[in-house]
Amino acid sequence: MSDWLIETETLAALLEADPSADRVVLDCSWYLPEAGKAAIDDFHAGHIPGARFIDLTEVSDPDSPFVNMLPTAAHFASVVGGLGVGAETEVIIYDAGYVSARLWWMFRAFGHARIKILNGGWRKWRTELRTVETGYPMPATARNFPARPVGQGVARLHDVRQIVDHGGAAIIDARTAARFDGHEGSGYPGVTSGYMPGAINTPWARFFEPAPSYRFVSPARAAQVFAEYGVDLTGPIVTTCGSGVTAAILGFMLEAIGHTDWRLYDGSWHEWGQHPDTAKLKKPA
């Protein structure tokens, strides 16, 4: 797990000691449409010195009817290369909530291994009163980013329908209990709420320490959380959520405990909930 995380004090020291290193810090903060605000405005109000903003919408598939879907390798390479990320660049990602694991998963899916998440993210950085910048960052020099085609770590609609109908893997859903149960809106206009038959609700927030830490829980604690929700860690797992964002948190924690047999359902509920032929359940109020 330490291979994919960097602590705030470590990053602060690196930025001061070696500011010219082949390193790019990316703020990937993002809001659900129902929030009615844009994360880029928060970035302009304050960000880690030298950081650049990566827009989750911009780095997703522009032609998909579903939000936050993986783009082509060429599209991903164009966006991140334009932010100054090259083949050997160390990428450090952070946000103000729950998005960093999605970018961690995307970079890995496209073949980039030099990727770390700032443990505790922007909230911990600010709580510790570390240096911040405001406004726009300096323009980045575009680099060539050699993205490879996505491999086996992605589950598609037909894969998940097969699992729902015939088994073969556990499906774990990272959304809040209220969204999963269908007692709260999906978060996306026009998309019904509820859950897939057989899915296990495993809320993403259980994998973070409370304020003022905001850090990921330890692998030992993560294993306990999975056990509390009855997740079978002996077989394959598919992670899902509203639109493939917090599902990556579950995947990150599965990797942390050594469970590598997992895939992320990229369309997640935004796709499943809109499909006319998928089974959708709700729990009684």
Name what the model sees in each region:
Residues 1-285:
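Cytosolic catalytic domains that perform sulfur/thiol-centered chemistry
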